[in-house]
Amino acid sequence: MPEAMTAMDSQDERAQRLVLVTGPSGAGRSTAINVLEDLGYEAIDNLPLSLIPRLLDGPARPMPLALGVDVRNRDFSVANLIELIDRLTRLPEYAPEVLFLDCTTEQLLRRFNETRRRHPLRGEGSPLDAIRAERDMLGPIRARADVLVDTSELSPHDLKAELARWFETEPGRRLTVSVQSFSYKRGVPRGVDMMFDCRFLANPHWRTELRPLDGRDSPVQQYVMADSRFDEFFRRVRDLVLFALPAHLEEGKAHLAIGFGCTGGRHRSVTMAEKMADALAKAGWQVSIRHRELERREKAPAPGDEGHMRAARTAWAQG
């Protein structure tokens, strides 16, 4: 993924950062607003477009601003929003950016069906008709986006990590490193900067006593690390990452994502991720760790219990 190039790059560094958050209903706009608020933005959602200039004419704010805009805004129209974007771009005191949350039509339809929420544009037609109409309506805004994020395969956790890459508010903050394991069968995670394939290492899956365990368990780690290729592989990857981290920090990056993949995302990749996170932390870097497939298993609802899944789906359908 390319480096985050924002409107701020060409404006005075003293200009206040202003993010307009929009996109089709169900793509995660409300979730994005909450994430930006957590990142230190003053977040305001669904303010009528006609009131935004009045808001900005007031006293300077001590923090960057994130404004949620969608078809539910009282006076929303594509022409009005484009006019607002053009007006903001001409103001020297602001550095506006358009964040567009996108999603496939199929995934949007699935989210609305699962949460049973009514699409804001649905009249007599079907939800699919409303989704397509909104997508067509927002086409010109999408074309004007400074940052485009496709949430089709992102969890709320993934979206938070992705937005942190683009909209971190503390440029002096130390670079943080996220290490994650994943299964190639379920697809490569979005937003990974450095990715390493662990499928050549000895596979504990074929050992009956190790199969139900995972790479956080000592017997599995010992088995994987007993592979004669493990030590050199680990050392080379660790040294490469430790070499690259200071360079990324000098370039102004706030976050670096490292992924380790194997077939099932349960044993080899988890072992490598655990060991690498520990090594980087000992080297003084701020590290977080995530095991994507293990999280999916742990969060899977028991038969007949769909409470957790409904909550996750609702988080998307609200925005």
Curated annotation (Swiss-Prot):
Residues where ATP binds: 23-30
Pfam families listed in its UniProt record: PapZ_C, RapZ-like_N
Compositionally skewed regions (Basic and acidic residues) per UniProt: 296-309
Keywords for the protein's UniProt record, in alphabetical order: ATP-binding, GTP-binding, Nucleotide-binding
Gene Ontology MF: a single term: ATP binding
Disordered: annotated segments: 296-319
Domain of life assignment: Bacteria
Statement: the UniProt record of this protein carries the keyword RNA-binding: no
Record keyword Kinase present: no
Residues holding GTP: 70-73
Job of this protein: Displays ATPase and GTPase activities.
Family according to the record: Belongs to the RapZ-like family.
NCBIfam families the record matches: PRK05416.1
Entry protein name: Nucleotide-binding protein Pden_2850
Originating organism: Paracoccus denitrificans (strain Pd 1222)
